[in-house]
């Protein structure tokens, strides 16, 4: 089946990461619909409705070949996000979907991992992650543990996402107070980056490619380029004060050993000093795509 004969559904098309994908699909001549939260109705190729009852939405009456899922219910519990996943999988089963492309994140990997590629296992316990990452871990496990006959699931795991001409967020990277710039990490803390437009290009190639991979890592794999410290110096032209690695790790290990700090508390400290190198070479080869170095970064 050629690309123009495929029917695609984009779930969560209004998200930051998805912005611009619609124009990319239109230019490529792709037949697609969009779905997001709201009153149950259809406006052109945009359908809204209850995400927990997606499989019962009467406006999504067609069969689809591919579903691209961006939806993550921020401010909702892990259980509520899994409830949406249950409806999503039922929808895929009912509509004979052949390929589900799940927009995941590199945050699903264990904080203590030293090297990650497309074959690496993700974090086993979502409680070891905070907020956003915990939901991503739980959702990925749910999708892997509930296979649907005839449906292939691909996990697209991008690094920290940036795009042009938007305000830069320091969240999770730098705290600037009272004339001081405190790096949330040290000189070796990794921060792999990926341009949003590069993600869209990769998605188009995933859709076009007959051989589907289970995991795609989308990020710049350059070790020197991908650190918080270098990013902050280039982006904000400041030399930040680093957190003391050995001091904080000794305290964290001590509190854990006497039972004051739980494992998930300890791992969050480890996450501040993440040393993980993400090797996206297999993805670049599979998609014939150079993920390259950044030129301007905005964290999304």
Tell where the protein language model's regions lie, with residue ranges.
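Conserved Rossmann-fold NAD(P)-dependent oxidoreductase catalytic core, especially the SDR/UDP-sugar
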Residues: 87-131
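NAD(P)H-binding glycine-rich loop region in Rossmannoid oxidoreductase-like domains
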Residues: 44, 48-87, 91-94
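N-terminal Rossmann NAD(P)H-binding glycine-rich loop of SDR-like oxidoreductase domains
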Residues: 8-28
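C-terminal amphipathic/interface module of NAD(P)-dependent oxidoreductases
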Residues: 242, 262-300
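NAD(P)-dependent short-chain dehydrogenase/reductase
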Residues: 149-191, 196
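Mid/C-terminal beta-alpha module of Rossmann-like enzyme folds, strongest
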Residues: 202-263, 300
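Catalytic helix-loop patch of NAD(P)-dependent Rossmann-fold dehydrogenases
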Residues: 114-161
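Glycine/proline-rich active-site loop of Rossmann-fold NAD(P)-dependent oxidoreductases
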Residues: 137, 162-173, 205-216
């Amino acid at each position: 089946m050629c690309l123009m004969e495929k029917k695609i559904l984009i779930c969560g098309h209004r998200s930051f990461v998805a912005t611009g994908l619609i124009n990319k699909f239109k230019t490529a001549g792709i037949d697609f619909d969009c779905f997001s939260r709201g009153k149950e109705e259809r406006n052109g190729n945009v359908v809204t409705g209850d995400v927990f009852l997606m499989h019962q939405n009467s406006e999504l009456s067609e069969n689809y070949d591919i579903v691209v899922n961006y939806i993550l219910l921020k401010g909702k519990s892990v259980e509520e996000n899994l409830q949406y996943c249950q409806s999503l999988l039922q929808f895929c089963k009912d509509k004979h979907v052949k390929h589900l492309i799940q927009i995941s994140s590199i945050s699903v990997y264990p904080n203590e991992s030293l090297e990650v590629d497309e074959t690496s296992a993700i974090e086993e316990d979502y409680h070891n992650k905070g907020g956003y990452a915990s939901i991503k871990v739980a959702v990925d496990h749910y999708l892997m543990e509930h296979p649907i006959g005839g449906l292939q699931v691909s996990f697209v795991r991008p690094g920290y996402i940036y795009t042009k001409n938007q305000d830069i967020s320091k969240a999770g990277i730098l705290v600037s107070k009272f004339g001081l710039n405190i790096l949330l990490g040290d000189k070796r803390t990794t921060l792999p980056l990926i341009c949003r437009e590069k993600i869209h290009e990769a998605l188009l190639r995933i859709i076009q490619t007959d051989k589907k991979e289970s995991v795609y890592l989308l990020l710049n794999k350059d070790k020197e380029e991908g650190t918080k410290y270098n990013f902050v110096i280039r982006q904000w032209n400041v030399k930040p004060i680093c957190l003391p690695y050995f001091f904080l790790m000794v305290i964290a290990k001590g509190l854990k050993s006497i039972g004051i700090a739980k494992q998930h508390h300890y791992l969050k400290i480890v996450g501040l000093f993440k040393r993980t190198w993400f090797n996206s070479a297999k993805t670049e080869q599979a998609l014939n795509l150079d993920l390259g170095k950044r030129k301007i970064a905005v964290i999304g």
